[in-house]
Amino acid sequence: MFKQPSVSLALIFFGIVTLGAISGLGLAQEHSLSHQEQKMIEWVDKHQDKILAELKSHVEINTGTDNVAGLNQYRDLLSTELATLGFATKTHSSEDIDVLSCKGGQLQIADHLVATLSGSAANKVLINGHMDTVFSMDDEFQTLKIEDDGVLKGPGVADMKGGIVIMINALSALHVQGLLDDVNLTVLFNSDEEIGSLGSRQLIEELAKQHDIGLVFEGTYNNLATRARKGLGQARLRVIGRESHSGGAHENGVSASLEMAHKVIEVEKLTDYQSDVTVNTGVLSGGEKRNTVPGCADAYIDMRFPSLEAGQKLEQSIKEIASKVVVENPKYPNLPLVESWTVLHRPVKAENAKVDEIIAEAMALSALIGEPIIGTRYSGGGTDGSITQAVGLPTMDSLGMDGKGAHSSREESTVQSLIARTKLAAVMLARQLHK
């Protein structure tokens, strides 16, 4: 039986405030570790080389969202690791995603992994992470580099292979102490988080409704815990024009790229920093040859917003922009044709009293264990924790690696963060599972 150590809580306001005023969140000033918790920390210290080697093996399996084979390989590895700890594992499939673009077609989604321990413990805990990264198979950034000063550089080291390795090894530390016996715990690894969890959202919501608390092992930066997040949306535009020789028959063409240029200018005007709304045309393509009037153009757009109403307003604005054609050619009155697709894929993650309690405990424990969490932040980035909390599951995210440079070849973290966060995760999981 796991015994909770006595805790004396004295509520104080945070001295560090990041990206907005924070009030009413208490910090546990006094904490002590139980004998079992100390033994878990010792286990992590003893297995540092093993944990680092596992991180390298995880990072060097390419799991770009479109690399189904790589994701299948990684899922099988995770399934084996969890089965060794006594979990029952099951895969869940998603329908392919239709892509509105000049090339068209569908994006195949790799199967997701759900692992469960079904005991009689009262508190039902859901922990989750995503297997996919933004790095494709042909990206040059494919390996983990361990530098002499302990800096780790590699694809997904912070987002979020590091978080997964932390999670697995924290569970291993609990397993050695017998602290996974008779618990109610579900682990979810999805394969499409980097494209908005479009295929896995229903599964995430269903599982969230069956649990009492959620923990997400996404990374963070500057040792800050994420208290609230913006909502996220995405949109696609496709313009169909008419190809023609740009020299001999320019007048017979209808430029899809010209029409799209007008669209992008209007879309970018939707950014309003004062309202905390941003819009970014992240991917833009048009035409195939220099000497041909482009017959097709497409754009892939990102939206960030502070409220559901603001997100819905963005959706409507993009649809209105798509409905107004600017380029004209009297010979072809039905062209250009503009199509749009929008989705609000991440709800706003608001402050939550239960989550604040978990953050306060995490801050106190981290100060005791090492690499303390020094404050909180409001983030414009998204996680699946936004989805779980939107359906009623209090969810703390940002329990993974402290790092920087995510989604770029500069992505990095540290060995210190890997080990310290594994210790913190082990203690926090033990306490949540045995409440």
Language model features by range: what are they?
Residues 29-39, 63, 81-84, 236-435:
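Metal-dependent amide/peptide-bond hydrolase catalytic core
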Residues 10-21:
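Bacterial N-terminal signal peptides
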Residues 30-152, 176, 385:
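Acidic/His- and Gly-rich active-site-bordering loop/insert found
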Residues 132-148, 228-238, 364, 401:
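Acidic-glycine-rich active-site phosphate/pyrophosphate-binding loop
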Residues 160-234, 272, 433-434:
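Acidic/histidine-rich catalytic neighborhood of metal-dependent amide-processing enzymes
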Residues 149-159, 373-376, 408-409:
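Short pre-catalytic strand/loop immediately N-terminal to key active-site residues, enriched for Gly-Thr
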Residues 1-12:
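Bacterial N-terminal signal peptides that target proteins for export
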Residues 24-28:
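Sec/Tat signal peptide C-region and signal peptidase I cleavage site
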